Amino acid sequence: MIPQEFQERMQQMLGDEYEAFLQGYDKPRFHALRRNPLKIEEKDFLEKVPYELKPVPWAQHGYYYKHEDQPGKHPFHEAGVYYIQEPSAMSVVEYLEVKPGEQVLDLCAAPGGKTTQIA
């Protein structure tokens, strides 16, 4: 159940787009992970990861996986080969377009997914 106060605030902010926003809550959730390019090349990653992955269109190293795969239990996750992250969270760094040598202060860096993506 979505709190009434939140619904009212979102309706005020979104106007005509509010109904589409609400419909999003009735759709299935997407699950994704992000490959760590500092740890493994894409070709090797796709050959070694035991899941059927589909690219996240807006995230250079992002992939959708099936919920039942549970990649958080695989040793690659613990080794930092990939990071489990919401696909929408990946878009933030992609749109930021950080260039080498630039510095970024992530004021909301917990647990640090976007920070590792910037690295």
What are these model-predicted stretches?
Residues M1-A119:
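S-adenosylmethionine
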